[in-house]
Amino acid sequence: MLAENIQFQTISWEGYDHEDRYRVYAFGRTEDGRSTCVHFPYRPFFYVGLKKDGPNVSHLSILRELFKLFDRKVEKYFPCDRHNNEHCGFCDKFARTPLWGDYYMPGVERFVPHSSVNLWGFNNENKIPTVKLVFKNSKSMRSFRSKIRFHQDYEKNFQLFESNLDPILRVMHVSKCSSTGWIKVPYFLTTEKHTNCDIEIELQNYKDLTPLDRQDIAPFRTGSFDIECFSETGAFPKSTNKEDLVFQIGLTRQDYGRPELMKVGLSVAPCQESQ
């Protein structure tokens, strides 16, 4: 249910493949200190082009060369009354040249024609044709990228663009959100929580993220600890040695912008009170 918009400052971004889909998680706190998580699906992608240039290079020719790289055939036929076949594979006159929508490859959700300026070398700002490969998840993207890069014909014929860019950085770029900035999102409470945050919101996509021009800092909670150990042998203590003990732990916790500081000392035996 939509109640209102909520503003919070992000402190951590994470991305995972969940149920065969890539999802982005943004964690942070509101100005009143409530922990917040926003998550949404995202489709990672990269671009592929040909190293050769000229008028014969088009989006469709790139796609054809890509399919040749993997020895995949795309054959489309019109219905044939002669052979009573819905897709006749016997009569050449019924065959047609594959169209853009006929190309399909497992793991790739869709192929998108794209034109952009190649920053390598001098191109006089002329755009070159490329094909944008959109994937369902990061596993499929990494697998397909490796298949192209480690193919024997890759260095000779193909170029990959932005294939090593982390999808999290891509989300920040396209949404114009900074890694530790303030953002505003619609207050859609999720029906099934995946975290222990006070507020968890599930969005449709990254377009629901609105960056805010705020310089204040949310009351993030900082925790620190220090341990004192005993070593049976005098060497560095080992957790696998039962005689090497942690005999004292010191803890502090503070919320940013607030003077209260929590101090806790834990000891395996009574100790003298600190001054």
Predicted regions and their residues:
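The two-metal-ion catalytic cores of nucleic-acid processing enzymes
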Residues: M1-Q275
